[in-house]
């Protein structure tokens, strides 16, 4: 059985499968055929500790990831990483997009340390930070190309990591978001600035959803959907007060949607 692990940054549960008014129709359609975990919580409200806990099955104080990987924190034992474990047990392991368990996202040495046999990740040099949703799209295209030629005789673990919905958000509000009707989540003040900020988040979520839908469509077109466990999740809450970096429900409550054939 193949495993497709799709993960986002800073999305919390602010997506349509969880009742949020977010333009994430592809994810909502997928959720209708999957298990939607409504009480999923991450092990830490910051990026690297949360991801390291999920991918090692151990708490941050056990695995050593007590802060952000790009600031010098790391796992005590990288052999505990899921990609390492699966690679030792017959899986071809593939990384496309971000990882946050070793160094910075595009650390050239990190994929091998984490246990990935193959790296598909595009260069991000041509993109400004607020344009990284386009980088996510380029990586989605690379995932799709890889799925077209995947070896049917060799199970794979493919990690597709998106920068979305991390700040800074796209500057232009997409057509799928009508800023006139956007409201920031409680307890954020409702004013012109916060409504615009929320519209930018929803725009980021829209682009994330388009990339998610593209990958799932190719998985199906390649005849692999019924041979693949698909896991969608995020690391922690949205980058807002009382959310990300906070031990509140909105800080550690995460989206977790899994489809098992």
PLM region spans:
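Formylglycine-dependent sulfatase
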Residues: 1-261
């Amino acid at each position: 059985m193949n495993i497709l692990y799709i993960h986002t940054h800073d999305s919390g549960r602010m997506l349509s499968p969880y009742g949020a008014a977010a333009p994430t129709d592809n994810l909502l359609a997928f959720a209708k055929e999957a298990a939607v975990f409504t009480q999923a919580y991450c092990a830490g409200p910051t990026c690297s500790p949360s991801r390291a806990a999920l991918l090692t099955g151990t708490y941050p104080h056990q695995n050593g990831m007590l802060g952000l990987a790009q600031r010098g924190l790391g796992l005590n034992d990288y052999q505990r990483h899921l990609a390492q474990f699966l690679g030792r047990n017959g899986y071809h392991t593939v990384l496309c997009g971000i990882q946050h368990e070793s160094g910075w996202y595009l650390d050239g040495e990190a994929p091998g340390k984490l246990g990935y046999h193959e790296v598909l990740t595009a260069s991000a040099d041509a993109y400004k930070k607020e344009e990284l949703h386009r980088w996510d799209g380029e990586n989605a295209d690379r995932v799709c190309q890889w799925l077209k030629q995947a070896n049917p005789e060799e199970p794979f673990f493919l990690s597709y990591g998106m920068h979305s919905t991390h700040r800074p958000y796209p500057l232009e509000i997409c057509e799928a978001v009508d800023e006139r009707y956007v409201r920031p989540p409680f307890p954020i003040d409702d004013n012109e600035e916060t409504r615009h900020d929320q519209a930018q988040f929803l725009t980021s979520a829209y682009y994330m959803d388009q990339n998610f839908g593209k990958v799932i469509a190719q998985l199906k077109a390649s005849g692999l959907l019924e041979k693949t466990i698909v896991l969608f999740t995020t690391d922690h809450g949205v980058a807002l007060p009382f959310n990300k970096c906070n031990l509140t429900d909105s800080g550690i409550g995460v989206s977790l949607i899994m489809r098992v054939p």
